[in-house]
A protein has these predicted regions:
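Residues forming the flavin
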Residues: 3-155
């Protein structure tokens, strides 16, 4: 959105209230979108309190806790989503669904690294971080295979 100066849509629902989701809510508003809401599966936001205030409260964006996306509507593009409340186990609560019109669903849920490929290749893995062991140049124990980003650590 920022670099390419191109908006994916004008009416946004965000799933995930960690700091990245909160900051994206603010960025989308500043770029001219209407953020309908932020939905969070857990009973509390994963973001910093100041980000909740500066990114949601300051822009009157509702935060729905214990809530997830049950359905995405639309054929060629998103036309809306069905949100639903969830119980303590993260399971949808029947009868708690409601529809939110939107043309964009921004997913900001979990930065858990995907290490299946490096593990499957037989790379040496770090028991503490869950990611591959790398050298100074970020090369794994397999020559020519490099790692970066979230695979190097886990939240």
């Amino acid at each position: 959105v920022y670099k390419r100066q191109r908006m994916p849509g004008k009416n946004v629902v965000i799933l995930g209230s960690g700091d990245i989701g909160l900051i994206m809510a603010r960025r989308m508003v500043l770029e001219g979108a209407k953020v309908q809401c932020v939905a969070e599966l857990r009973p509390q936001s994963g973001g910093l309190k100041r980000n909740i205030v500066q990114c949601l409260d300051d822009f009157n964006i509702p935060l729905y806790l214990n809530t997830t996306v049950a359905q995405i509507h639309g054929r060629d593009r998103v036309e809306g989503v069905t949100l639903t409340k969830v119980d303590d186990n993260g399971k949808p609560i029947p009868g708690s669904e409601w529809e939110v019109p939107c043309d964009t669903l921004l997913l900001s849920c979990g930065l858990i690294p995907e290490n299946e490929l490096t593990r499957g290749l037989g790379a040496d893995m770090d028991g503490k971080t869950g990611g591959p062991i790398v050298g100074e140049n970020l090369e794994c124990s397999i020559p020519g295979v490099f790692a970066c980003g979230n695979v190097l650590h886990r939240p």
